[in-house]
C-alpha cells in the first residue's frame, strides 16, 4: 500500500528533476503574471486529465498518473508562492 509520505517524496523528486531541466520557470511566470499563471497551467493539466479519462494516451509519458502528479506539483508550487508572498 502506497502512503501519503511516499507520494509526497515522489512529487519532490519529480519537482527536482523537472526544475533541473526547465529551471525555475514557475516562479518566474508567477512573478510576471501572478495567479493567472498557475491557473492556466493547472487548467491545461485538468483538460489533459479529462481527455485521458475518455481515451488512451497517444503519447507514452502522458498517463493519468503522470497528469495527476503534475497537478499536485503545480498546486504545491502555487502554495509555495502564496506562502512566500505572505511571509508564512
What are these regions (language model features)?
Residues 1-88:
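Intrinsically disordered, low-complexity regulatory regions
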